[in-house]
Amino acid sequence: HIFDFTNVPVVGRVILALVVCIVLCTVFTSIAGFFTAKFKMHPFISTMANMLVIFGLVTYATKGVSFGSIEATIPNMIIPKVNGCPTIILWALAAIVIVWFIWNKTTFGKNLYAVGGNPEAAAVSGISVFAVTLGAFVMAGILYGFGSWLECARMVGSGSAAYGQGWEMDAIAACVVGGISFTGGIGKISGVVVGVFIFTALTYSLTILGIDTNLQFVFSGIIILVAVMLDCLKYVQKK
């Protein structure tokens, strides 16, 4: 079979999976970025539309059937445990450092702030709004691909096309709680990290308290609603 790589060494399959994840995610986010940059579409809309397309394609390709787990040697190769603690946190720290550096120490990062805050003013100052917007989506695609690769390494048991559904809302909630503004141009990496810790702690607390999993979505929705409302109020006051 054309997609049968069982004869390929494990290391080769791991590297191939990483390349495929990053390439596919970058291609799809680039498409969303193009529509956002070219037609001034709201990034939330283009991203959600993209997500539906991807989910449909994956469901069609797998026929909605669950697939088996990966070899036990692969998780130990990518995210081995040290004294019982998973080293996936080291990958997360590496991603934080890299994104922080891009955001704060490069011209592209400074242009991101400018375009997010006021695209018209950024264009007048000579910044290519199209290139910066597309670049932001490409960078997101690379991170998505890398994250999906790590998540596959964590997978225990069978998986399905629906795996990970709803996580995008958790990511949005964590960012909003961390001070990222929906109006653009406001936010720091440190704030996102704090937001992730707060939202994760809240989720685990609800689980420990025995709150029904379905009701946890209600709490997540309320958090997003309140955080965005406060963000909008700050924006209106600034105006």
Where are these regions (language model features)?
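Hydrophobic alpha-helical transmembrane segments
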Residues: 15-23, 45-48, 89-94, 134-138, ...
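Transmembrane alpha-helical segments in multi-pass inner-membrane proteins
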Residues: 144, 155, 159-218
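Hydrophobic core segments of alpha-helical transmembrane domains in multi-pass membrane transport
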Residues: 22-25, 51-59, 91-102, 137-148, ...
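Helix-loop-helix "hairpin" substructures at the membrane interface of multi-pass membrane proteins
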Residues: 13-20, 27-32, 83-159
